[in-house]
UniProtKB/Swiss-Prot annotation:
It holds the Pfam family UbiD_C. Mn(2+) binds at N172, E238. Prenylated FMN binds at I175, Y176, R177, R189, W190, L191, R194, G195. Catalyzes the decarboxylation of 3-octaprenyl-4-hydroxy benzoate to 2-octaprenylphenol, an intermediate step in ubiquinone biosynthesis. HAMAP family: UbiD (MF_01636). It comes from Yersinia pestis bv. Antiqua (strain Angola). It is a peripheral membrane protein. It is found in: Cell membrane. This is 3-octaprenyl-4-hydroxybenzoate carboxy-lyase. Pathway: Cofactor biosynthesis; ubiquinone biosynthesis.
Length: 495
């Protein structure tokens, strides 16, 4: 199922009982967060607050609050199908030339999908049905959520920030939180390694003193939103990947105030610029770690135009201790990562980012071990291959007889196959999440690798233990006898 815009997606969700309209007046100050948090933890529907207190614009929350809805947003019916999305990304990252006619025929569907990658530019678009500019620009018209009691101010959480570096043809889409600073000002909290920040750094070097054009789209179609959080190759625009997911080209329109292109069907678009050197202290905010983060300085985004659809919907979320919406999305996107990693490291059997580990700070990898030291090579590969794992603090590597997604299995492997001194890798002074207050200094910390694999002769002089396993003939005989033994009553079974 493909969706042309957010409203198309919401219509389907409502048909399937995956959207709940809330007509009671609910305050964007704290109340929406509490309702959304309770709903998400119960695996509940997306929420459309139709009457936010003090506003006429409805607020959409919990859109991707289940892995199933993330898969649906990517045009799939099941989370397991996201492996196919990962295979497509792996192909785009390092395409292999066809090895013959049969191979060419097998790859034709992928080549056909590539035809949907270029954007389609429109002369007019729904996102520009209403326009405010100059003195009429007022962010207080938008029911921006104030999520937690000690948050510094209301926070734009689901804005797709659109930028272009001075030496690049493609545009970058990234999701960066934005603190409301005034009627026409936001603080753009992007980390130095993210695409928007890199575009800005290059602009400052190429055009000293000149304003950096920026646009922020709110309420884009699900394919475009999810493309912005998917590990697309650096050479590929998120718009192009959204076209692949959607099955037709991403429709865009030129901004009114600059040359950036924004999603034509977006509910709201903020246009403006960053003045070089214009910085402001951002935070504190409750974040996906479950803590309030430190205050730090980030660029100020000055909004010159607000454009929107008639009867626009404001798309929002909150972040907090997992599970929250980013953690749920992490569970779904985990399936996308696996084929990408397997393309580079075929020995990887499974890869898991536990949501309770903030969906990126700890990874469990299972491999078909082939030589001594293999686990350490995989650790280094995980940390260096994709930018998304730059901030992964812990990598646990196990053999393929271990279920990476079962802590009972993983803990057993750690406690029986590891020597803490021999099998632990510690690396100091590596890039670390700025939100990680446990690191010695902001943005710089250490990483730990745990080799929980069975050790080969070159790795230990001792005889290695053999796992206990019952004789298969005995198991088969007891299987046949089990029901007759009636060890558990029906009452016990129900317990």
């Amino acid at each position: 199922m493909k969706y042309r815009d957010l409203r198309d997606f919401l219509s389907l969700l409502e048909q399937r009982g995956e959207l709940k309209r809330i007509s009671q007046p609910i305050d964007p100050y704290l109340e929406m967060t509490e309702i959304a948090d309770r709903t998400l933890r119960a695996g509940g529907p997306a929420l459309l607050f139709e009457n936010p207190k003090g506003y006429s614009m409805p607020v959409l929350c919990n859109l991707f609050g289940t892995a199933k809805r993330v898969a649906m947003g990517m045009g799939q019916e099941d989370v397991s199908a996201l492996r196919d999305v990962g295979k497509l990304l792996a192909f785009l990252k390092e395409p292999d030339p066809p090895k013959g006619f049969r191979d060419l025929f097998d790859k034709l569907p992928k080549f056909k999908q590539v035809l949907n990658m270029p954007t389609k530019r429109l002369n007019s678009a729904p996102c520009q049905e209403q326009v405010w500019q100059g003195e009429d620009v007022d962010l207080s018209r938008i029911p921006v959520m104030h999520c937690w009691p000690e948050d510094a101010a209301p926070l734009v959480s689901w804005g797709l920030t659109i930028t272009r570096g001075p030496h690049k043809e493609r545009q970058n889409l990234g999701i960066y939180r934005q603190q409301v600073l005034g009627k026409n000002k936001l603080i753009m909290r992007w980390l130095s390694h993210r695409g928007g920040a890199l575009d800005y750094q290059e602009w400052c070097e190429a055009h000293p003193g000149e304003r950096f054009p920026v646009a922020v789209a709110l309420g884009a179609d699900p394919a475009t939103i999810l493309a912005a959080v998917t590990p697309v190759p650096d050479t590929l625009s998120e718009y192009a990947f959204a076209g692949l997911l959607r099955g037709h080209k991403t429709e865009v329109v030129k901004c009114l105030s600059n040359d950036l292109e924004v999603p034509a069907s977006a509910e709201i678009v903020l246009e403006g610029y960053i003045e070089q050197g214009d910085m402001a202290p951002e935070g504190p905010y409750g974040d996906h770690t479950g803590y309030y983060n430190e205050i730090d300085n980030f660029p100020v985004f000055t909004v010159t135009h607000i454009t929107q659809r008639q009867d626009a919907i404001y798309h929002s979320t909150y972040t907090g201790r997992p599970p929250d919406e980013p953690a749920v999305m992490g569970v779904a996107l985990n399936e996308v990562f696996v084929p990408i990693l397997q393309k580079q490291f075929p020995e990887i059997v499974d890869f898991y980012l536990p949501p309770e580990g903030c969906s990126y700070r700890l990874a469990v990898v299972t491999i078909k071990k082939q030589y001594a030291g293999h686990a350490k090579r995989v650790m280094m590969g995980i940390w260096s291959f994709l930018r998304q794992f730059m901030y992964t603090k812990f990598v646990i590597v196990c053999d393929d007889d271990i279920n990476a997604r079962d802590w009972n299995d993983v803990i057993w492997a750690i406690t029986t196959r590891m020597d803490p001194s021999r099998d632990t890798v510690l690396i100091e002074n590596t890039p670390i999440d700025y939100l990680d207050f446990a690191s010695p200094v902001s943005g710089l910390g250490s990483k730990m690798g745990l080799d929980a694999t069975n050790k080969w002769p070159a790795e230990t002089p001792r005889e290695w233990g053999r796992p206990i396993k019952m004789d298969e003939d005995v198991r088969a005989r007891i299987d046949a006898l089990w029901d007759e033994l009636a060890i558990f009553s029906d009452k016990d079974a129900k317990r």
